[in-house]
């Protein structure tokens, strides 16, 4: 869509340099940042097997869609800024760009919606999430997302073609295949997903708030002591058995079966306290992604609706509408492509392990489990100290008279299982 679509008067072929140059610089920075960030995201996830989790698979899909959106849109967008007409790329490129852009946009919003549902199930219905293979389910959902994105993009893209205004060629809508297609797109791929996401986060927030009330003030105080510890993943090593259990919701449950000599009630209490704080960090990360998505994409859909309804307002208001449309075109264009480089930045800032793996890839170092966990060894000691200090006011050990005494078979070392060890490893948050 171009400003020329609002009037048969195409106007000047280029806006003033005071607008064109800054916008070009912004587009260039977005393109470089987005391409580097999304390609690096894919490489980091692919090379590090410990990051082959459901959440990272969604992130991988998101990076692919963002990269395709940048590749198909920014070069032609910059070309259009410097020369609004004539369109020199031909009809095939015009239609192909529409197909790729619509597919990528649809895949982005569907992916964000999908892993929001994934987080809701993991936090509010953990037993349901553990009953199914999260990784295999994520793969199936991602494949379905891309199929839906392509199928719904084809009718949109097929409407594009080369149109002629006063003998000047432009890329625009030349045929109507689906009536009210852009209105439907706004509802299906923006309003409905955002409503679903907001409702699910509200339910998650209520669930976490109720969990806080159940745990009581002592648990809140303990969580305050854990705030200095990164929560990529917290593992609990119990009674020297050497069996670790992930508290990020992404494990298979094998760690639970390997625990020896422990109290189920105590283990549940420890798991709840540690997992609660880690879940809140995961939640903040996903909320940030969703909020940025809304801020970046709302102007894009608003600009589309203005382009559709503004011409019907009448000739007297046409100039005002054209000014608003022109401003919205620049604002929505910048924010539209800015969304493609925000996701890698958000995940790098909020995930210690991803940040370490990202730096390792950038500096050409081999991505290894040990290199990603070097800092976590220090943080594990901080975690142990925090838990030791908190136990002075309320010990969460199994030294209670209500707990059965461990047998020799349960504790081969014949040491009291109160010697619980806590360790941090660099498993990506799932």
UniProtKB/Swiss-Prot annotation:
Record-linked SUPFAM superfamilies: Family A G protein-coupled receptor-like (SSF81321)
GO aspect biological process, one term: negative regulation of peptide hormone secretion
**Which branch of life, at top level?**
Eukaryota
Q: Could you list which ranges are Cytoplasmic topological domains? A: 38-53, 118-140, 207-281, 343-430
- Residue ranges, Extracellular side: 1-16, 75-96, 162-185, 303-321
Where does it reside?
Cell membrane
Residues glycosylated per entry: 5
Ranges of compositional bias, category Polar residues: 388-397
Report membrane topology: Multi-pass membrane protein
Enumerate the transmembrane spans. 17-37, 54-74, 97-117, 141-161, 186-206, 282-302, 322-342
Q: Which cysteines are joined by disulfide bonds?
A: 94-171
Where is this chain primarily localised?
A: membrane
Q: State a GO cellular component annotated for this protein.
A: membrane
**What molecular function does GO assign, one term?**
pyrokinin receptor activity
A Pfam family matched in the record: 7tm_1
Key words of the record: Cell membrane, Disulfide bond, G-protein coupled receptor, Glycoprotein, Membrane, Receptor, Transducer, Transmembrane, Transmembrane helix
The record ties this protein, via PROSITE patterns, to: G_PROTEIN_RECEP_F1_1 (PS00237), G_PROTEIN_RECEP_F1_2 (PS50262)
Give me the ranges of the annotated region Disordered.
388-413
- Which family, according to UniProt? Belongs to the G-protein coupled receptor 1 family.
Q: Briefly state the protein's biological role.
A: Receptor for the neuropeptide CAP-3/pyrokinin-1 (TGPSASSGLWFGPRL-amide). Also activated weakly by other neuropeptides terminating in the sequence PRL-amide including pyrokinin-2, Hug-gamma, and ecdysis-triggering-hormone-1. The activity of this receptor is mediated by G proteins which activate a phosphatidyl-inositol-calcium second messenger system.
Question: What's the protein called, per UniProt?
Answer: Pyrokinin-1 receptor
């Amino acid at each position: 869509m171009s400003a020329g679509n609002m009037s048969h008067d195409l106007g000047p072929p280029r806006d003033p340099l005071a607008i064109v140059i800054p916008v070009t610089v912004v587009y260039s920075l977005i393109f470089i940042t987005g391409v580097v960030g999304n390609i690096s995201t894919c490489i980091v996830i692919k090379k590090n097997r410990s990051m082959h989790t459901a959440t990272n698979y969604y992130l991988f899909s998101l990076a692919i869609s963002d990269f395709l959106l940048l590749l198909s849109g920014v070069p032609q967008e910059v070309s259009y800024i410097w020369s609004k007409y004539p369109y020199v790329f031909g009809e095939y490129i015009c239609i192909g760009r529409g197909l790729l852009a619509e597919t990528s946009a649809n895949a982005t919003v569907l992916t964000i919606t999908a892993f929001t549902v994934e987080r809701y199930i993991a936090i509010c219905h953990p037993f349901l999430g553990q009953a199914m293979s999260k990784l295999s389910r994520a793969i199936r959902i991602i494949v379905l997302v891309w199929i839906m994105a392509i199928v719904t993009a084809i009718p949109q893209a097929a409407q594009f073609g080369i149109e002629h205004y006063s003998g000047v060629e432009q890329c625009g809508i030349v045929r109507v295949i689906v009536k009210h297609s852009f209105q439907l797109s706004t509802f299906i791929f923006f309003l409905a997903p955002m409503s679903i996401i907001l409702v699910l986060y509200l339910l998650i927030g209520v669930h976490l708030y109720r969990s806080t009330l159940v745990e009581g003030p002592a648990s809140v105080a303990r969580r305050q002591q854990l705030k200095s510890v990164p929560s990529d993943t917290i593992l609990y090593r119990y009674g020297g058995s050497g069996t670790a259990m992930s508290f990020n919701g992404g494990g298979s449950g094998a760690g639970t079966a390997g625990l020896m000599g422990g109290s189920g009630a105590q283990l549940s209490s420890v798991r709840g306290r540690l997992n609660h704080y880690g879940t809140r960090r995961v939640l903040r990360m996903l909320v940030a992604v969703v909020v940025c998505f809304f801020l970046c994409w709302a102007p894009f859909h608003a600009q589309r609706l203005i382009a559709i309804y503004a011409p019907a307002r009448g000739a007297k208001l046409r100039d005002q509408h054209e000014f608003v449309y022109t401003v919205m075109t620049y604002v929505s264009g910048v924010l539209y492509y800015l969304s493609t480089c925000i996701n890698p930045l958000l995940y790098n800032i909020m995930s210690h392990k991803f940040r370490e793996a990202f730096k390792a890839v950038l500096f050409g170092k081999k991505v290894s489990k040990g290199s990603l966990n070097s800092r976590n060894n220090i943080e594990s000691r901080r975690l142990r100290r925090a838990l030791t200090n908190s136990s002075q006011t309320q010990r969460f050990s199994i030294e209670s008279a209500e707990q059965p005494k461990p047998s020799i078979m349960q504790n081969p070392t014949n040491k009291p299982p109160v010697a619980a060890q806590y360790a941090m490893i660099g498993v990506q948050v799932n």
